[in-house]
């Protein structure tokens, strides 16, 4: 009962609703679940999900939200806690251009870069590529560090430069 009350107050009059939770199941529950915001969604409202989730889920949510009279964009974040605290996040957005133009001014308040990649799901796909690039870069650095000075070189110095930044 309490969850429904919170959901209704949080979403029934909102033009834009932002979510950022743990994973696909959490997003699905918050938006589509029995107490999900979709049940009190205002006509023509926009749901922006900042969770790093799957592109398949983004496409699923888009269908349900459109059917309920709203719009959806997937907009995963990059930059971590430090980026969030300093308003320097990078946001990769998937959705319609007209919907993006409505939510971008809000996201510009906490992002240094907010880019429309393509249709719904594209933001998640771009984030996946970003994560693969970061992991590949770190693996490459660690591999090369082990070869310096017959493996006696410490990789600690790399923690203090851009190699370890998100």
Predicted regions mapped to residue ranges:
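Rossmann-fold NAD(P) dinucleotide-binding segment
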Residues: 7-71
């Amino acid at each position: 009962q309490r969850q429904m009350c919170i959901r209704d107050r949080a979403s029934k009059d909102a033009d834009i609703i932002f979510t950022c939770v743990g994973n696909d199941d959490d997003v699905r529950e918050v938006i589509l679940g029995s107490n999900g915001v979709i049940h009190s969604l205002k006509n023509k409202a926009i749901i922006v999900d900042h969770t790093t989730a799957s592109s398949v889920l983004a496409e699923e949510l888009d269908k349900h939200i459109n059917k309920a009279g709203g719009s959806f964009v997937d907009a995963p974040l990059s930059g971590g806690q430090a980026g969030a605290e300093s308003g320097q996040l990078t946001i990769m957005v998937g959705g319609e251009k007209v919907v993006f133009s409505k939510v971008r001014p809000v996201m510009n308040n906490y992002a240094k870069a907010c880019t429309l990649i393509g249709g719904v799901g594209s933001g998640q796909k771009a984030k996946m590529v970003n994560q693969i690039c970061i992991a590949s870069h770190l693996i490459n650095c660690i591999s090369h560090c082990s070869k310096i000075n017959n493996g006696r070189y410490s990789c600690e110095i790399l923690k203090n430069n851009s190699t370890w930044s998100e």
